[in-house]
Amino acid sequence: MWASRDHLPEPDLGDAAPPGSPSSFWTSGLPRQERSTSRQRSRGSPSSTCVPYKVHALATFECSATSHASRLWQTLQQFWADHISRPFSPRRPPLRRMPSLSTFYLLDHNTRQAELGLAYGAPCMRLSNQAFVFRGGRWTTESQLARTRSPLLSRTAWGWKAQVQRSKSQVLLEENNYLKLQQELLIDMLTETMARMHLLEKQRNPEVIPTAAARAGQRKMRKRAGASAGVLMIQPCALDSQ
């Protein structure tokens, strides 16, 4: 393959080259300097056209890279704010209402133990149609155990009933005292209200009470006069009948 003319070395023959030399054919009658400048222009023209394209591509890549980095940073900040930076503050449960509580919490320890305490029974066993109970380190029949436990059970039941009666009587006494206090307060309020009402009536109508008293006196006088006239009318009739 033949090499192109652009890559062949040029011999240094000075300013003048003899006719028939290779340089005379390559120059084709053009000066040496003009040929070199034209060659430089032809070589520099493609690079000058490629530079703006490369700059534009680099700027586009930088913009896309910065936008992608900013998106990643925003996503990381949002994740940090949602999951890590917030303090742990769980929601408080709703408050328990008093009516939902059982009334056994108001009782004393002994009553609660008697009502809600666990009562484990003694181990039992049955042999040949007879029941045995292990209590006090020995096996006893159920009939003997019933005889021995009957007074104990009666005492404990009586004591528990007496305690319940005491607590009930105490509650009733407190309720009675509270009702008495309310009754006295209502009576005082009623008395004060009646006194205010009479005072307002006197201030608004001061002549009502005297007129009412006068009317009552007139009625009494009329009754007395009617009674005396009736007596006088009866006397002549009585004399005629006699």
Swiss-Prot record:
It comes from Homo sapiens. Homodimer. Interacts with CIBAR1 (via BAR-like domain); both proteins form a ninefold symmetric structure at the flagellar base; are recruited to the annulus in a mutually dependent manner and regulate annulus positioning. Belongs to the chibby family. Residues 172-186 are annotated as: Leucine-zipper. Residues 1-10 have a biased composition (Basic and acidic residues). It comes from the Eukaryota. Plays a key role in the correct positioning of the annulus, a septin-based ring structure in the sperm flagellum, serving both as a physical barrier and a membrane diffusion barrier that separates the midpiece (MP) from the principal piece (PP). This positioning is essential for proper sperm motility and function. CBY3 interacts with CIBAR1 to form a complex which localizes to the curved membrane region of the flagellar pocket. By doing so, may provide stability and rigidity to the periannular membrane to prevent membrane deformation. The keyword Chaperone does not apply. 'Chibby' is Japanese for 'small'; the gene was so named for the RNAi phenotype seen in flies. Changing residue 117 to A: Reduced interaction with CIBAR1. Keywords: Cell projection, Cilium, Differentiation, Flagellum, Spermatogenesis. GO terms for cellular component: sperm annulus. This is Sperm annulus positionning complex subunit Chibby3. It is found in: Cell projection, Cilium, Flagellum. The gene is CBY3. GO terms for biological process: spermatogenesis. Residues 1-49 are annotated as: Disordered. PANTHER family: LEUCINE-RICH PROTEIN, PROTEIN CHIBBY HOMOLOG 3. Its main location: other. InterPro entries: Chibby_fam.
